[in-house]
């Protein structure tokens, strides 16, 4: 009875250790109990396995100990096991004749013997793990053998084909089997692709806690982990914090080797571990790596173990022994994963996943297997690496079985392991437990791999073909060069071609241009230099490689800088400057200013060209200007055909070559004076393509014959008038009008810009030579009355040139020509050289010396500084001595008429030169008599519009006079002649109606008008005053002519409000809606009686004469 109880105690302790460790290796307990006589009992092994299968891990077991039903079942299994052991011992007759003391001694030695066997097994397993990587090359086999392969005598037991035993002693070099059940393991997240059973994978671990845990696991002979694929491939972690971070299906893997390494980027210490997956597992529960969770788990374990109060003292003692880990030396052996909690890593409770049963003879599985093998064969023909992997896998299959069709599951795993599929696809294969579905998914991934391999092979062949072709061409060209070098033939063509290729390598040619260049360079290489086409192609390639393909200057859109530049270059012109700043501000917001064509319209000399230069400076763009005034050949814009001798590209292409940037500012000057269609084409029509933002992105020059992008070019045009610009061309441009300057603006421009520049160019920069403000004002009144400042600039330059002449005369400087001195020096040098010819060496030395002296003399003459004018020499130009410098005045008075006779009125006109005063004169050709017939004669080179205006004004005047003064019959017999002075100047425009009507009425009423009144406006037949244009220019002209009152249409009040104050200053505006407003201002003092009787004496005589004739 004592023997029976002790045997139960030994058995109970062994079973409890197995439950805690989770080490349920098949029949291993039978090997460990050989020394105690417990050998080969199959029922014992079966009951032991049932007992183990009651719980998947140790935590569940301890909870079940509190359940009465589970505890009762445990006692039943224990009783059956002990009973079987006793019956087996009684059947064999062991221990019957032995004394009871000896039996008791054997039973007490059971536990140390078993523990010794465990130590021996662990040493063997450590040796197996160290040599596993070296022994296995390529995919490893997970199939177990049927019998032990170690040599032994006596009874031996098979252990998955890994270990053999004889007399209960395992072989020293035998492999330690991996556990079939391992409920709780450390979890390791894997990124990018999952692991598959039977196929090695190296992972890099950077977490220090995980590295220490793996090292400790290896030292404890338990290097097992659970590897799970991360759902987010961008996450880089070695610890799982939440279960939803990874897929719940992974692999149970063994760390076969681990060695330290370093991160190449950060230099941090890492560990490279080689993992060998054994089987699929499922994540049941995650134990996150938090201290709070660890404390909670320990508290739950303590409570669970504290309530264990079962009837068996042996079970209670074993549980207490496992809790008191510090008091027992075998604590680490009894708890395989408990030590990992100290490293704060993630632990998981897992369960094994087994493949579903399948029919090896299924036609679907066999067909899928055959198709996979076929795809493998095709890939192996394209990819060498695949070929090696397939060979290794085939060798491993042949070592375990003779037919690949017997293991389709391994074939599917191998296909997934070697394919570069998507993460989700590979994970689906790992989660597939149905072999048919796994084969289908593996085949899909493998088909994609085949497509990638075919594409890669095609690309590789194409690249290889190109490389071979280039190498062949290079080899032949080098041979050709060598042959020419030996024959002494060197025409420079090869160097020319190399220079073209070198220039192209620095450019970014579009694909179409690159193709043209390659074709032309190939053609050039086949031509002889003496052929005429060689020169044509050479020039063409020179132009292609000279254009700035892909070169763009960096723009700047600084508003303050642009404003500063505009103020430096121009005075006034506030409206124009604001418009340009708006343009730059829009470019700053958009980051570009392409697609805009600006047209500056204004009289000559107002700064249109200089404004364009200022815009280029403010935008940091290159500037190019060309004029199209009088251009009649379309080839100037579009270029000539290459077939012509001396053919050249158009002006725009030449601008790109000169500026060396694709975004210059090109100024097209005098666009209103461009020629029209003729035998050489229409240049204006060619400009349509050039200036159209929708078309100039692929501008086709006749010479280049390739599309050129001009959309980044900023085009600025200038014109004096919009009348002659073709309407389609005008629609493509944004017009900005530049008006003339008033006297105050001209004075400031002359003082701040024109005078300093002219003074410097005359060499009087440091001289005491000045022009007074009164002189400038007098210069504008009597010499320069144009709207711009070009004539003023010429007169100022003339003044400074005469002043320079006077300064030089005052200084009495010797004016001996410098050239004579140089000639004399050269003659002296030649004489010295001829005298020193006695010695060759002396001659050489002296001639060299003299030549150096001559060079120094020339340099000293060239670098001679400007003349300094003493302060005592002073020249002042004022209004009194102005005529000494520029001659007598051209305009002696401000107005043509100081007092206007009847019929003379000051009108205002707009011309391409700006505004001007235009007088209208009306006179009676002969006195009023009874025989004269009323007629109207017009002179002054009037245009058709002005002729119609005069006829309309004449009719309106007759109607208005008859209405206002019915007794005044002036127009019944008046023979009138209307003239506009300066008959050599053509005149036309729709704004002279009011002026002509006022002239007719002034003559009819025989009243002279105020000479300080200027007027403009067009009349209708009923007397309505219509809107006109160019009010600013006309106001400037009125002020320049000394007018004090300006009459204009009421509809132009908005234009008047926008005029600068310096223009409106001194002018009294009168906005007329009907002619009655004009009449009241001009003839307000004429009463009805006076108007009716002004010609009463003349008409009295006429009536008397007619009465006599009728009698």
From Swiss-Prot:
Stored CDD domains: RecA-like_Lon (cd19500)
Full protein name: Lon protease homolog, mitochondrial
Recorded name of the encoding gene: PIM1
Keyword match ATP-binding: yes
Transmembrane intervals: none
UniProt superkingdom: Eukaryota
Record organism: Kluyveromyces lactis (strain ATCC 8585 / CBS 2359 / DSM 70799 / NBRC 1267 / NRRL Y-1140 / WM37)
Enzyme class, broadest EC rank: hydrolase
Ranges of Gly residues composition bias in the record: 145-167
PANTHER family found in the cross-reference section: LON PROTEASE, LON PROTEASE HOMOLOG, MITOCHONDRIAL
One GO-annotated biological process of the protein: mitochondrion organization
Family assignment from sequence similarity: Belongs to the peptidase S16 family.
């Amino acid at each position: 009875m004592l023997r029976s109880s002790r045997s139960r105690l030994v058995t109970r302790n062994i079973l409890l250790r197995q439950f805690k460790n989770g080490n349920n290796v098949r029949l291993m307990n039978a090997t460990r109990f050989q020394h105690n006589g417990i050998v080969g009992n199959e029922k014992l092994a079966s009951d032991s396995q049932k007992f183990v299968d009651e719980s998947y891990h140790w935590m569940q077991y301890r909870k079940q100990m509190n359940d009465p039903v589970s505890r009762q079942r445990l006692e039943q299994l224990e009783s059956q096991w002990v009973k079987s052991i006793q019956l087996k011992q009684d059947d064999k007759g062991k221990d019957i004749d032995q004394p009871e003391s000896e039996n008791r001694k054997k039973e007490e030695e059971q536990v140390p013997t078993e523990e010794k066997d465990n130590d021996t097994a662990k040493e063997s397993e450590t040796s197996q793990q160290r040599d596993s990587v070296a022994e296995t090359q390529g995919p490893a086999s997970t199939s177990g053998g049927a019998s032990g392969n170690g040599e032994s005598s006596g009874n031996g037991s098979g252990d998955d084909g890994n270990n053999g035993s004889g007399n209960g002693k395992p072989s020293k070099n035998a492999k330690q089997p991996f556990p079939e059940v391992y409920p709780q393991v450390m979890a390791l997240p894997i990124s990018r692709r999952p692991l598959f059973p039977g196929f090695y994978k190296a992972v890099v671990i950077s977490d220090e806690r995980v590295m220490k845990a793996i090292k400790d696991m290896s030292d404890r002979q338990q290097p097992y982990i659970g590897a799970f694929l991360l759902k987010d491939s961008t996450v880089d972690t070695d610890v799982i914090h939440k279960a939803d971070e990874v897929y719940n299906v992974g692999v149970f893997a063994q760390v076969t080797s681990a060695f330290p390494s370093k991160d190449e980027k950060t230099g941090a210490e890492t560990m490279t571990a080689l993992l060998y997956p054994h089987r699929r597992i499922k994540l049941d529960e995650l134990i996150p790596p938090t201290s709070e969770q660890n404390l909670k788990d320990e508290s739950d374990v303590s409570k669970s173990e504290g309530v264990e109060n079962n009837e068996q003292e042996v079970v209670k003692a074993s549980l207490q022994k496992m809790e008191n880990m510090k008091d027992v030396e075998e604590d680490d052996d009894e708890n395989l994963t408990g030590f990992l909690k100290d490293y704060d890593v993630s632990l998981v409770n897992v369960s094994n996943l087994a493949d579903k049963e399948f029919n090896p003879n299924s036609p679907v599985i066999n067909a899928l297997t055959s198709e996979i093998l076929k795809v493998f064969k095709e890939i192996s023909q394209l990819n060498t690496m695949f070929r090696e992997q397939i060979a290794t896998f085939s060798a491993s299959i042949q070592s375990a079985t003779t037919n690949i069709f017997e293991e389709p599951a391994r074939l599917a795993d191998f296909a997934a392991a070697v394919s570069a599929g998507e993460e989700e696809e590979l994970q689906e294969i790992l989660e597939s437990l149905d072999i048919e579905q796994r084969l289908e998914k593996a085949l899909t991934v493998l088909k994609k791999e085949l497509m990638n391999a075919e594409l890669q092979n095609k690309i590789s062949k194409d690249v290889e073909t190109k490389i071979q072709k280039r190498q062949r061409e290079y080899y032949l060209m080098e041979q050709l060069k060598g042959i020419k070098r030996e024959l002494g033939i060197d025409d420079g063509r090869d160097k020319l071609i190399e220079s073209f290729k070198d220039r192209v390598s620095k450019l970014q040619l579009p694909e179409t241009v690159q193709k043209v260049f390659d074709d032309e360079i190939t053609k050039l290489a086949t031509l002889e230099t003496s052929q005429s086409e060689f020169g044509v192609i050479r020039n063409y390639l020179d132009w292609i490689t000279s254009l700035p393909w892909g070169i763009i200057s960096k723009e700047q859109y600084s508003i303050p800088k642009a404003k500063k530049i505009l103020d430096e270059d121009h005075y006034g012109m506030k409206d124009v400057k604001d418009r340009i700043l708006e343009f730059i501000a829009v470019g700053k917001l958009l980051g570009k200013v392409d697609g805009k064509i600006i047209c500056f319209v204004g009289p000559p000399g107002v700064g249109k060209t200089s404004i364009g230069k200022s815009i280029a400076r403010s935008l940091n763009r290159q500037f190019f200007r060309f004029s199209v005034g009088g251009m009649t050949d379309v080839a100037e814009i579009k270029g000539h055909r290459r077939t012509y001798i001396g053919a050249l590209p158009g002006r725009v292409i030449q601008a790109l070559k000169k500026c060396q940037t694709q975004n210059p500012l090109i100024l097209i000057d005098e666009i209103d004076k461009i020629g029209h269609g003729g035998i050489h084409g229409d240049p204006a029509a060619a400009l349509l393509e050039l200036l159209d933002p929708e078309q100039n992105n692929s501008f086709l020059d006749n010479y280049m014959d390739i599309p050129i992008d001009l959309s980044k070019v900023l085009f600025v045009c200038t014109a004096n008038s919009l009348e002659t610009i073709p309407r389609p061309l005008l629609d493509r441009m944004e017009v900005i009008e530049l008006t003339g300057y008033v006297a105050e603006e001209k004075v400031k421009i002359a003082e701040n810009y024109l005078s300093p520049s002219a003074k410097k160019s005359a060499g009087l920069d440091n001289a005491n030579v000045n022009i007074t403000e009164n002189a400038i004002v007098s210069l504008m009144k009597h010499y320069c009355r144009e709207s711009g400042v070009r004539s003023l600039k010429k007169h100022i330059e003339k003044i400074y040139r005469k002043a320079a002449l006077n300064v030089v005369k005052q200084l009495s400087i010797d004016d001996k020509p410098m050239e004579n001195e140089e000639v004399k020096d050269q003659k002296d040098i030649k004489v010295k050289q001829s005298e020193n010819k006695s010695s060759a060496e002396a001659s050489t030395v002296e001639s060299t010396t003299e030549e150096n002296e001559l060079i120094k003399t020339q340099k000293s003459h060239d670098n001679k500084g400007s003349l300094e004018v003493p302060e005592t020499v002073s020249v002042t130009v004022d209004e009194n001595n102005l005529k000494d410098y520029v001659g007598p005045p051209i305009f002696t008075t401000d107005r043509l008429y100081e007092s206007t006779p009847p019929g003379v009125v000051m009108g205002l006109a707009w011309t391409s030169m700006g505004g001007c005063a235009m007088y209208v004169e009306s006179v009676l050709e002969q006195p009023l008599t009874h025989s004269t017939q009323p007629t109207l004669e017009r002179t002054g080179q009037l245009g058709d519009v002005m002729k119609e205006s005069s006829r309309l004004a004449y009719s309106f005047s007759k109607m208005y006079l008859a209405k206002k003064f019915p007794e005044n019959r002036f127009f019944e017999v008046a023979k009138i002649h209307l003239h506009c002075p300066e008959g050599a100047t053509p005149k036309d425009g729709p704004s002279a109606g009011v002026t002509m009507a006022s002239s007719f009425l002034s003559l009819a009423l025989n009243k002279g008008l105020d000479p300080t009144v200027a007027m403009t406006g067009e009349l209708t037949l009923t007397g309505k005053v219509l809107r006109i244009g160019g009010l600013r220019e006309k106001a400037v002209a009125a002020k320049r002519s000394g007018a004090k009152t300006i009459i204009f249409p009421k509809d132009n009040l908005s234009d008047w409000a926008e005029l600068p104050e310096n223009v409106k200053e001194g002018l009294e505006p009168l906005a007329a809606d009907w002619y009655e407003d004009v009449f009241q201002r001009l003839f307000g003092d004429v009463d009805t009686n006076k108007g009716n009787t002004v010609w009463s004496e003349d008409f009295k005589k006429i009536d008397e004469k007619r009465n006599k004739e009728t009698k």
